[in-house]
Amino acid sequence: LQSKDSADTAVYEGELMSQWGGASFKASDAPAKASVTYGGETYTGTYRDSEYRMGNSYITHYYTGDNCYEFGINSENGKLVGINFQTESFYKKESAASELRNARERAEEVARECAANFVNLEECGEPTVSVVPLGDESGAAMDLYQYFFCRKLNGIETRAYVAVRVNSRGMLVSFSLGDLDSFDKMEADSARFDSLNIEDEIRKAFQNIHPFPNGTIVEGPDIDRAFYAVTPQGETVIIAAAQATFSLQQTDENSTQDTEPIGAG
């Protein structure tokens, strides 16, 4: 949803979401080699590919690391926007390490230490946390803790975030950054969305774009998630993912069809 002023909204279709959700590509202006520093250590790598990550205004260039699995940089300023540390040596250390009794507490400490390098944690509030059970190379049980630190505007998430993954042995697995540099623009433009009723706009979108001309919305739409973002074209938008259930009316009097849930973003 994009608002030019408080009374003018529009629903983006096709082009923008294809750009954000498109496949990776080779960028002709990406440096063949790059180096970044994190935690006092320098990581070097060879260019692999690029993509517009969902909700970011910039292109991310990805590099296959010499001493990490991969890292990403902001194409506009060369800043580090993420590292995955999972090399063969990482897996060996992981298998040799022991499970921590206070695994969750230690994981959060590690995640906060990482995120604090990039964002003021007091501006994010409490992170959302998810736990994924998995195993190490030897097959031993292990948990992966995923932390999401996010700045919000009027209770709505923004793409100014830091996502951190830590295993139950206290090892930092990876981190990735959203569009931190665009928060000020999102904040400045947010007043233009004050009168916007997201639920109403989503309902209009379903009524206008759903593929069943004989269908009627019988449930929803329910918004799964919404967040502020800045497009690659420099416009502040609210991206909302929602789903609704339609009742399909058949033209054949002898045929019937159950309601069918349809999702839209």
Task: Place the predicted regions along the sequence by residue.
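Preferential activation on post-signal-peptide N-terminal prodomains/segments
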Residues: 1-144, 148-155, 159-161, 165, ...
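Compositionally biased, intrinsically disordered linkers/stalks adjacent to structured regions
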Residues: 200-247
